[in-house]
Amino acid sequence: MANTVFCKKFQKEMEALDRAPLPGAKGQEILQNVSKQAWQEWQHLQTMLINEKQLNLMQSESRKYVMEQMDKFFNNEATDKLAGYVDPDDIKEL
């Protein structure tokens, strides 16, 4: 049986990550408090934010922005919206 964690994003016991996704204390915090599903959803949003806002992760401001958005996402706070993005689940067939 897979390891589980109480996910702070979904507020329930869910499948845990296999290993810390980031180095250091932040990675351990995520490993102990974020489910595999929440991490995958964050990676999807992170990719969209980086692409839409044309972030250069070599710049400290961009890395700081991404980390702030990640914290907001996992704490169920509002994250920045992407201009013109429509969730595929919201599209109704014509």
Swiss-Prot record:
Transmembrane segments: none
Gene Ontology BP terms: cellular response to oxidative stress
InterPro entries: Fe_traffick_prot_YggX, Fe_traffick_prot_YggX_sf
Keyword Nucleus belongs to the record: no
Keywords for this protein: Iron
GO MF, any single term: iron ion binding
GO cellular component, one term: cytosol
Database matches in SUPFAM superfamilies: YggX-like
Record's function text: Could be a mediator in iron transactions between iron acquisition and iron-requiring processes, such as synthesis and/or repair of Fe-S clusters in biosynthetic enzymes.
HAMAP family: Fe_traffic_YggX (MF_00686)
Family: Belongs to the Fe(2+)-trafficking protein family.
NCBIfam families: PRK05408.1
Protein name: Probable Fe(2+)-trafficking protein
